[in-house]
């Protein structure tokens, strides 16, 4: 019976080869070949790193801020693009908080999140939420320009709130892009 593998693997440095350890540090620096099976360090911003946690928290913060600003207006449900932005911000906030908790766990137990399945799930999830968030931000930006510049009815609407929520959604997407790219790079480099 095969046992299941955990999704989080420890990353430890391999012991130096016996010949190199006996010759001293000069021999290790000059002609040392990396031992087989040793993984390189995770790049900053990858899942399970402090920078990755920072990116996830930034994504969640800006998505929550966009949601709060848009929900503070009473007429956002009348425009479907703004309702789409609210739904996308909720999804982005939940996804980012979920992965922030995973990053916190990985940092607390000092484990790496370079498992192929985990990286694949992170990449697909980041791609989906990123596409939805960018689409919602673009749609909201288009409606905001229509209301403000083309129809000139900002006096009747909350244009400043709409613009602020749209800008925060774009910032949330900009915080998501490095995570998605790093996850895709990690997945593709296997």
Curated annotation (Swiss-Prot):
Main localization is membrane
Where found?
Cell membrane
Tell whether Membrane is among the UniProt keywords: yes
| Segments for region (Disordered) | 1-31
Q: How does it sit in the membrane?
A: Multi-pass membrane protein
A single GO CC term for this protein reads: plasma membrane
Please list every transmembrane segment annotated in the UniProt record, as residue ranges.
51-71, 82-102, 127-147, 165-185
* InterPro entries, per database record: CASP_dom (IPR006702), CASPL-5 (IPR045009)
Low complexity bias locations:
1-12, 20-31
State which ranges are Cytoplasmic (membrane side): 1-50, 103-126, 186-190
Q: Which residues lie on this side of the membrane: Extracellular?
A: 72-81, 148-164
Does Transmembrane count among this protein's keywords?
yes
Which terms are listed as keywords in the entry? Cell membrane, Membrane, Transmembrane, Transmembrane helix
Subunit annotation: Homodimer and heterodimers.
The UniProt similarity line reads: Belongs to the Casparian strip membrane proteins (CASP) family.
The protein's name is: CASP-like protein 5A3
Organism encoding this protein = Zea mays (Maize)
Q: What is the lineage of its organism?
A: Eukaryota, Viridiplantae, Streptophyta, Embryophyta, Tracheophyta
């Amino acid at each position: 019976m095969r046992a299941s593998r955990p999704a989080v693997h420890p990353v430890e440095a391999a012991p130096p080869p016996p010949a190199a350890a006996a010759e001293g540090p000069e021999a290790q620096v000059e002609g040392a070949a990396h031992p087989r099976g040793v993984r390189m360090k995770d790049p900053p911003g990858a899942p399970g790193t402090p920078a990755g946690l920072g990116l996830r928290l930034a994504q969640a913060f800006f998505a929550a801020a966009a949601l709060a600003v848009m929900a503070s207006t009473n007429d956002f449900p009348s425009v479907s693009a703004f309702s789409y932005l609210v739904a996308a911000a909720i999804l982005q906030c939940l996804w980012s908080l979920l992965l922030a908790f995973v990053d916190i766990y990985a940092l607390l137990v000092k484990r790496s999140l370079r498992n192929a399945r985990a990286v694949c799930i992170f990449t697909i999830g980041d791609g989906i939420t990123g596409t939805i968030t960018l689409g919602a931000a673009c749609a909201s930006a288009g409606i905001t320009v229509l209301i403000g510049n083309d129809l000139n009815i900002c006096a009747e609407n909350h244009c400043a709130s709409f613009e602020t929520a749209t800008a925060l959604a774009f910032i949330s997407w900009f915080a998501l892009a490095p995570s998605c790219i790093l996850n895709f790079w990690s997945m593709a480099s296997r």
